[in-house]
């Protein structure tokens, strides 16, 4: 009897992989093990729940049992994996053991909470379950501090503000989206946030949190203080690698794999936010989709290398949305910006005047696809 392909985790990466496997093979045995309910939801929707007045259960697109039945898989929901026995090729879940032919880590990533005094007063919104846990507090809150002005923090700040909250957005950098684009390119979105009423505190970060009679006082490294009702940590994600590390697999920023998504153990693979593919983390939907297509083939006997074209990344800030592609943080690039009443197009050119990256914003988002084709031709 053929052993299972066992997948640990039930997020976007795992579901994409299962669907791709079923396109290629209707009968190969697949077992999905997840510590949560395994219900399907769209994680990017978490950035818009407050303005859309959605509760956690509203996000569910498909129950886990229905997904399992539709794709003919064995489902172990609400089941925590405690160890991997590589010699026996078994996944250990307490007293239960499951044999595997191939094993896939799709364990995702967890939100980072800075190790500061009062960190217990912070909450995170990195999953449907986390939102379910905290939604009552967020609905009641009038003053919200968002720590981290990256992609998720910026999206959350705008959403909370549009929902009528008084929002403070804090980052140690001098501009928003510092890991994604230079300040001159993010400036219009930054202006839009302030026009919406978001208070921006840049070049500083939270040093200490202290509970008061009327909220939580945040003290910053520059000496300022702000009292709020809730604090959301959006400073970044850390790949969930503990299980892989305990199994003596190679781990750095994520679970290390080659271009075939394979770890040094030829029976074990990694996919999604937990995977470090060729030294890179790729925590966006499109590379995960393409990775799932490649991995499905490899689990069934192929040896395909993942190749990724230039891909669009969307910053979902409805009052001034952005799309970007390419090496937007390259230090040797020259940016050309073009503005009109419809929005912005910013192009990053190299020394040979070749397009290496771009950002489009506002109503000029429709120009992204022609630029993406141009970018693909030059890379």
From Swiss-Prot:
It comes from the Bacteria. Pathway: Nitrogen metabolism; nitric oxide reduction. It is an enzyme of class 1 (oxidoreductase). The keyword Transit peptide does not apply. The keyword Flavoprotein applies. One of its GO terms (molecular function) is oxidoreductase activity, acting on iron-sulfur proteins as donors, NAD or NADP as acceptor. GO terms for cellular component: cytoplasm. InterPro entries: FAD-bd_OxRdtase, FAD/NAD-bd_sf, FAD/NAD-binding_dom, NO_rdtase_NorW, Rbx-bd. SUPFAM superfamilies: FAD/NAD(P)-binding domain. It is found in: Cytoplasm. It catalyses: 2 reduced [nitric oxide reductase rubredoxin domain] + NAD(+) + H(+) = 2 oxidized [nitric oxide reductase rubredoxin domain] + NADH. Keywords: Cytoplasm, FAD, Flavoprotein, NAD, Oxidoreductase. Pfam families: Pyr_redox_2, Rbx_binding. Signal peptide: none annotated. Belongs to the FAD-dependent oxidoreductase family. NCBIfam families: PRK04965.1. One of at least two accessory proteins for anaerobic nitric oxide (NO) reductase. Reduces the rubredoxin moiety of NO reductase. This is Nitric oxide reductase FlRd-NAD(+) reductase. It comes from Pectobacterium atrosepticum (strain SCRI 1043 / ATCC BAA-672) (Erwinia carotovora subsp. atroseptica).
């Amino acid at each position: 009897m053929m052993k299972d392909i066992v997948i640990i985790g039930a997020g976007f990466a795992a579901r994409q992989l299962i669907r791709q496997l079923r396109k290629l093979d209707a009968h190969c045995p697949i077992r999905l093990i997840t510590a949560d309910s395994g219900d399907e939801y769209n994680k990017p929707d978490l950035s818009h729940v407050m303005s859309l007045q959605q509760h956690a259960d509203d996000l569910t697109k498909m129950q886990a049992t229905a997904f399992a039945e539709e794709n003919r898989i064995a489902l172990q929901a609400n089941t925590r994996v405690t160890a991997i026995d590589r010699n026996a090729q078994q996944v250990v879940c307490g007293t239960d053991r499951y044999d595997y032919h191939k094993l896939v880590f799709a364990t995702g990533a967890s939100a980072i909470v800075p190790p500061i005094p009062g960190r217990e007063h912070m909450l995170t919104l990195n999953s449907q379950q986390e939102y379910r846990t905290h939604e009552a507090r967020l609905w009641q809150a009038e003053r919200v501090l968002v720590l981290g002005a990256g992609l998720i923090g910026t999206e959350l700040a705008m959403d909370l503000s549009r929902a009528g909250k008084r929002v403070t957005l804090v980052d140690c950098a001098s501009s928003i989206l510092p890991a994604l684009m230079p300040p001159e390119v993010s400036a219009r979105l930054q202006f839009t946030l302030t026009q919406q009423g978001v208070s921006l505190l840049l070049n500083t970060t939270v040093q200490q949190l202290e509970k008061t009679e009327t909220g939580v006082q945040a003290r910053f490294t520059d000496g300022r203080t702000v009292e709020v009702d809730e604090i959301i940590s959006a400073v970044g994600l850390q790949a969930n690698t503990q299980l892989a590390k305990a199994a003596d697999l190679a781990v750095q920023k994520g679970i290390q794999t080659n271009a075939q998504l394979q770890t040094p153990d030829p029976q074990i693979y990694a996919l999604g936010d937990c995977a470090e593919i060729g030294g890179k983390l790729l925590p966006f939907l499109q590379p995960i989709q393409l990775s799932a297509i490649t991995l499905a083939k490899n689990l069934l006997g192929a040896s395909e290398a993942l190749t990724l074209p230039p891909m669009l990344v969307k910053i979902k800030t409805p009052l001034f949305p952005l799309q970007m592609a390419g090496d937007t943080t390259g230090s040797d690039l020259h940016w050309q910006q073009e503005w009109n009443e419809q929005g912005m197009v910013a192009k990053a050119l190299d020394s040979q005047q070749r397009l290496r990256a771009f950002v489009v914003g506002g109503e000029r988002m429709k120009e992204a696809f022609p630029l993406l084709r141009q970018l693909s031709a030059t890379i």
